[in-house]
A protein has these predicted regions:
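Short, intrinsically disordered, charge-balanced linker/junction segments flanking boundaries
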Residues: 183-188
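Metal-dependent enolase-superfamily TIM-barrel catalytic cores that perform enediolate-based chemistry
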Residues: 1-76
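Shared catalytic-loop signature of beta/alpha-barrel
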Residues: 47, 53-56, 64-182
């Protein structure tokens, strides 16, 4: 018996549907696509997921292809997010100028630190684009990102990986409060 090949759009939508039905509307879903699709498939996947209300789809096509990202963003009502691997405001410029996404995900470690991330956030704000900083490398990066996030008007969310172990508590003076709803920004 040969079974029909399932479309990636339906497989992805089934996963997101299961998450939404299992948890209801009490939390936000962000879908990481990691540049796995071509434009046509990315649009089909976005359309199939739309009923389950994800906050955004992240890098539905390879992040290095601004034109492809723009095509997807223009074809869907879902917000497209990108940028965690970009390393300068110059690299982000085409995404903003071509309106290729609605959300930027800069990484403070790639952007030249706090000043670079803050500069990019202001640049994005001038294009009506929100920022959801990427943050996955450890306690120093988490605190630097939290400090920038607390000062930018176009912050959407801040990524945070709470997989950490005691290293966070040992590194951050005064501890580190993690709650899915907020981050305490310590004074140093």
């Amino acid at each position: 018996c040969i079974e029909p090949l399932r479309s990636p759009a339906f497989t992805a939508a089934d996963i997101v549907r299961g998450i939404r039905e299992g948890g209801g509307q009490s939390f936000t879903i962000c879908v990481e696509m990691h540049g796995r699709f071509n434009v046509a498939t990315a649009i089909r996947v976005a359309d199939a997921m739309r009923p389950y209300d994800p906050l955004f789809i992240e890098e539905p096509v390879p992040a290095t292809d601004v034109g492809a990202m723009r095509e997807v963003q223009l074809a869907t009502t879902l917000a497209v997010a990108t940028g965690e691997r970009l390393r300068s405001t110059a690299e982000y410029g085409p995404y903003l100028e071509q309106r290729a996404c609605r959300i930027l995900q800069p990484d403070v470690g790639h952007m030249g630190g706090i000043t670079g991330l803050k500069r990019l956030a202001h640049m994005a704000d001038s294009h009506y684009v929100t920022v959801a900083p990427h943050c996955c490398w450890g306690p120093v990066q988490a605190m630097a990102t939290a400090h920038v996030s607390s000062t930018i008007p176009n912050l959407l969310i801040q990524e945070d990986n709470h997989w950490r172990t005691g290293v966070f508590e040992e590194t951050v003076v005064g501890g580190y409060t993690f709650d899915p709803q907020y981050i305490d920004v310590p004074e140093v």
